[in-house]
Amino acid sequence: MELKGSKTERNLREAFAGETQARSKYDYFASVAKKEGYEQIAAIFQATANNEKEHAKMWFKALGGIGTTAENLASAAAGENYEWTDMYDRMAQEAEEEGFTELAEKFRQVGRIEKAHEERYRALLSNVEMQRVFEKSEETMWECRNCGHLVI
């Protein structure tokens, strides 16, 4: 059976979008509850957000959305490129046309950030492809991300 183009593929994409949006909302809601002193409610929002994350991962995997690190970097760079070259540019223009100048500027600002994200992912992808991730041409200090041990 071919998933591509099927109703099931469309449903997987909808489920993934719904779960990722719910996760983000619940993270935000948890922050508000915590600031207002509702620790238990914050914890429940956070636990539910973590559940939604796992649901989203299941649907994303079913869509074939998780590959090797190189594939993931290329995919991430392409997504960031779309966001800054198309999506946010269009959204800024439309917001401007409708008189939402502050939102238009925010769209533009985020677009500039997305461009930096794309550049960062492309640089990392180049390092992976050229096998330079763990090698540097100059003397470098490396820090263990777990315990903090330093090596020169």
Regions found by a protein language model. Give the residues of each.
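Non-heme di-metal
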Residues: M1-I152
